[in-house]
Amino acid sequence: MNNLRYWIWFTQAIGYCTTKAKQLTFLYNSIEEFYLGGESEWRLSGLFNNKEIEKMSKIPLDISDEIIGKCITYFYDTVCIDSPEYPKCLFDIDDPPAVLYISGALPDIDDRMSIAVIGTRKASMYGIKSSYNMAYQLSKAGVTIISGGALGVDCSSHLGTLAADGVTICVLGCGINYDYLRENAKMRSDITFKGAVISEYPPDTEPKSYHFPQRNRIISALSDGILVIEAGSRSGSLITVNSALEQDASKKIFALAGPVDSHFDGSNKLIKNKVATMVTDYKDIIDAFDNVYVTTELDVSAQPSDDVIDVIPIKGKPPENINGLKTYDLSEVPQHKENLNLSEDEKSVYYAINYEPVHIDKISEITNLPVFKILPIITTLELRGLIKCVQGRSYRLI
């Protein structure tokens, strides 16, 4: 606990994504020893400039106590860079986080195969279904799935893992209790029962634009390989790929080939330039590793049940009708499926939709549910192949 106080103090003074935390672990027996040495010792270390030393001298140690108290209140765990529990794969990069804040239980990432599944927030339905399906199958093979908790590909990969009863790690670019992407709050809560939501930023830290590139180095470091599902030419996913290759030039990069359009420019270019291996099946990823121990006794041939995702492409095959549109007589009585094991709110939303497009505001009016509660339900229903977004924020039965 003492080391935790000093490492939190260090991050409040120096910041995040710095090489200096790791360098201190080699120079001193403990961070406490460094702190107690005072300004003269900080200068002698040769690591800090005058501005940084001035900042350290002004930041009181008890600033850490408030953050630790918040962690205790919310039952968050913490792991310091010099703790035995700190992942070796994360320590091995140049700029590992001084502190990890954890909701849930961080799996033994060093001894378990892990794959990061990443892609655009504005994913197509093909990208959403593919990320869900690949994460589901990899999880069934015992692979830990790592992603960033964002909308689109990230969210779908986490949901696919949860559907497979697998283990997933969600790495955030803000404090883990910050109300960021409220529509994904339930997903993040569910992850903590089968994995962990983690961040290098203390609780209550607001997301900043530069946090997400910093966050990406953690995703890549924790992963044995990176799977890019759908990425444009300027996608943040490419930052994660570059980070992975800077950390380890032999890191395995995979990509799912997509249509020749701007949404897949980045993914396709990775394949074309031989930066990434093209995959069509989760086994392509498993087979690429010669010396990785996959901890599983699960049936890797198991497919997602029809009740869960009856139109999701199995083993990477695209849907028969990639646009997903079917022809219906709009005067036809909606044929809602039965026995879908939906929650009451999910049923309410599902039965508010028919073959003619229904706007989300109308769904809210019919169900008496706020839009922010409807959005994650809509995502679930889309992933299960029950509905489709056809225009704007309007939805119809499939």
Residues of each region from the PLM?
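Short, positively charged patches
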Residues: 1-129, 133-140
